């Protein structure tokens, strides 16, 4: 893949959709992969991008994001309204490590429904392709497409310290590694997986059928096809 630092002129020749509700955080310095590896749900030691979460010690989602590599740096593709809070949270764990954590205003997240540019979204190929490049294009259609596939993200949809990571279908969307070792919130998340006990999950409901009450078995819930295949 092109280095993000060298991609600007190349990406300007592509038809792009910029996700203006996303921001890019750059982490640079000594062993940034090792630093992030000990915090987030997914394995950032191998091929990137991956989808991951930063959880409470009880295993509830605080932030969700995609992690990309840019040379020795890591880039976090996150919800724009939560970017500053995520920078502060990551900085709490930095201690005396020589690592810089900051929003990179020169970069933006781009998306294409039909592919061609970038890489497939690691959560679900049907979400289309995305990449990080210069911030210069308007956004179109991404949120509607994502929600039609039953993929939630951000505090407006997942809440903050409200949803357990596996309730957000992280195990079905590649958002957690059960082999990487410790991270914040790992104990409860691993226990739920080991017991095969996820009491609640996010589903797609038909238009106009949303009710503000709890139900045990939403019989007319539309289970996304990717979840049907995974559970079969």
Task: Annotate each PLM feature.
Residues 166-176, 190-232:
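Glycine-rich, small/acidic residue-mixed loop/short-helix segments
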Residues 139-194, 199:
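A mid-sequence, solvent-exposed acidic-amphipathic segment
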Residues 15-26, 63-152:
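Acidic, low-complexity central loop/insert segments
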Residues 31-36, 83-87, 135-138, 212, ...:
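Short, conserved charged micro-motifs
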Residues 29, 76, 185:
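Residue-level signal for inorganic ion chemistry
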């Amino acid at each position: 893949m092109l280095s993000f630092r060298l991609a600007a002129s190349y990406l300007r020749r592509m038809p792009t959709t910029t996700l203006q509700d996303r921001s890019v955080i750059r982490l640079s310095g000594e062993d940034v992969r090792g630093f992030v590896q000990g915090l987030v749900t997914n394995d950032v030691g191998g091929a990137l991008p991956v989808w991951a979460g930063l959880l409470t010690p009880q295993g509830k989602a605080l932030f969700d994001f995609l992690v990309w590599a840019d040379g020795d740096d890591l880039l976090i593709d996150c919800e724009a309204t939560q970017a500053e809070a995520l920078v502060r949270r990551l900085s709490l764990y930095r201690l005396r490590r020589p690592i810089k954590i900051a929003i990179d205003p020169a970069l933006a997240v781009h998306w294409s429904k039909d592919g061609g540019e970038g890489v497939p979204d690691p959560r679900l190929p049907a979400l289309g392709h995305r990449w990080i490049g210069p911030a210069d294009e308007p956004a179109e259609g991404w949120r509607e497409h994502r929600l039609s596939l039953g993929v939630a993200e951000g505090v407006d949809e997942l809440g903050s310290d409200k949803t357990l990571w596996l309730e957000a279908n992280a195990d079905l969307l590649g958002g957690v590694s059960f082999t990487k070792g410790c991270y914040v919130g790992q104990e409860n998340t691993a226990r739920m997986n080991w017991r095969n006990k996820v009491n609640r999950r996010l589903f797609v409901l038909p238009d106009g059928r949303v009710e503000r009450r709890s139900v045990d078995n939403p019989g007319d819930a539309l289970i996304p096809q990717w979840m049907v295949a995974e559970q079969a």
